[in-house]
Amino acid sequence: MQGRRIWLAGLMSTAMLLAACGGDGDGTAIPASSTANGDAAGTTTNPSPTPPSSGTSTEPPAAQAACRPNGKFTYSGSASQVAANNGQLAVLVVPTLPPEYAKNRNMTAPNAPASSQVQQASGAFTTLASSAEASDCLGLDHGAVTEIQSVGTDVAIGRWNRAMDTDGNTYTDTQGVHYAVGTPLPLTATSGTLACTQLIADNVASRYSGDAGTLGSTSATLDLGTRTLNNLTLSINAGNSSFTMTSPQSPLNGVATAGTLTIQSVVVGHDPAQPLVAVGYSTTPAAGQGGIGGVVVLSCK
């Protein structure tokens, strides 16, 4: 994919930002409307990466140097530094690009090296990796990170758009690469269910030149016995229409596809009794038309 560029017409001039919902105690959500580093334009030049907050190696893998360019980035929103667990972070990446460019760049990594990720002082992640291998990382060469939000130090989300990545792909306001990075959380209970509701989400992006949108609400049931996310329902508002997408069952810390809908998830947080689940969703309709994607964090109680 190196060096290819995607040119699309009919772009939106700005991306709508979602306000974050609730959160309590040390799980307070930081909304996307916050501006990074106190800069009204949300712009940082030659940023200095901040290492994850705890339990991490400070030495990034030399094999992944190409995924850590010293680029010029702009930010919209802010997030806390995400806490690692024994040097590991959970990483979810969902590209919303035409399939020929997005291929093999979806990441669902419940335990990835914290030293392979780059989180800026603004809270934005500009390098993402599923392992320490050179082939398993993707960096932002230059451009915007928007809809940056977090839930305490448990998880942060955002979207790369109006940007170019280290694969050489460029993308627009309505496209992008969505991510969620959180503290890996092992579940201890082996029976029962938890009700999950939407806590924070980024914008719904379009693979091609369709309208971007918002995720109005999300709900699901977490089955502690089967370790699955059941009856996931996503309510989408895009353009002048609203519709619902459903996934009957998908594995926690895994990937499932039903029809045109693919669901990725990682379990994150600090309380096994009240876990958070970062969910990535994407669709790939037949004939290469349409297709949307995004990320959402669910609070399960």
What are the roles of these predicted feature ranges?
Residues M1-G10:
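Bacterial N-terminal signal peptides that target proteins for export
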Residues L17-A20:
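C-terminal motif of bacterial Sec signal peptides marking the signal peptidase cleavage site
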Residues G22-K301:
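Mature soluble binding/inhibitory domains
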